[in-house]
Amino acid sequence: MNDISSNTIQKEPFSIKHIVVSGGGQYGLTMYGILKEAHAKGFWKYENIKSMYGTSIGSFVCLIIILHYDWDILDRYFVERPWEKVFNFDLHTIMYAFENRGLFDQINFDELLKSLLLGKDMPINITLKGLYEITGIDLYITTSEVTNFELIVLSHKTHPDWRVLDAIYASCSLPIIFSPIIKNGCCYVDGGLFSGYPLNLSIKDGCNPDEVFGIRKISSNQREPLNTQSSLFDIVKHIMLNAMKSFNIIPLNSIRHEIIIYGNHTSFEGIIRFSTSKEERNKLIEEGSDIFTQFYKGLL
């Protein structure tokens, strides 16, 4: 199990109104497990949630929560679905990557979410504005625009006509693994480049820190050194990680309810392991449940 730390002071009753979820690759399932267990224990309630902030896989997790499915349905979706058919990796994938600017593209990614939208009678082309009108929850998604090299926050307020699927994909487009999304002359990649954990955005928007529940994944500083056996992905990963370290230097606000997950860096191998192993996916979810249970004991 991953090491965790927590910052908690307040006793029950809890009044969580805002949820912030960082990037974290395959650890998105751990974050899902945390939120699932937190809901089961009454730490947060759907009817109280006003806004959600997500970066990269965190934006995916936020959308999953906003759609308000039964947890059993989501468990089956994550564990039983044949993810290896969505992320099929073979020689064709490698050859296609050079032309497509990434191993996988939005077609692969849309497969992850369209069934969940359709299951709630939402069109697959639903916009951020349309999602807000149905759910009443503000969803803020970070992405990195590389043409102007700046952080972009997508929401129904600033980008109402963006498709939800485009916004989530733009936030999750880790270079090399996913091709970037290009719209109106702008190129969008993973939101973690400039804002791996959008906690400060929530506070800047006026969220009461005592009403924010933050889930943050921090990667180990240990990395395999580059050598003659290193792959193109290894090199790009080092560049991205160093860039993220350089750009994510603004001190984070302090909140009472925060869980920090310590784990490995997002890797191609980790994504493949996630997509091909039911046991791995179930393990990540159960770890999230255990992490929140330990966190919750500190509140009582």
Where would I find each of the regions flagged by the language model?
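Patatin-like phospholipase
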Residues: 1-55, 63-300
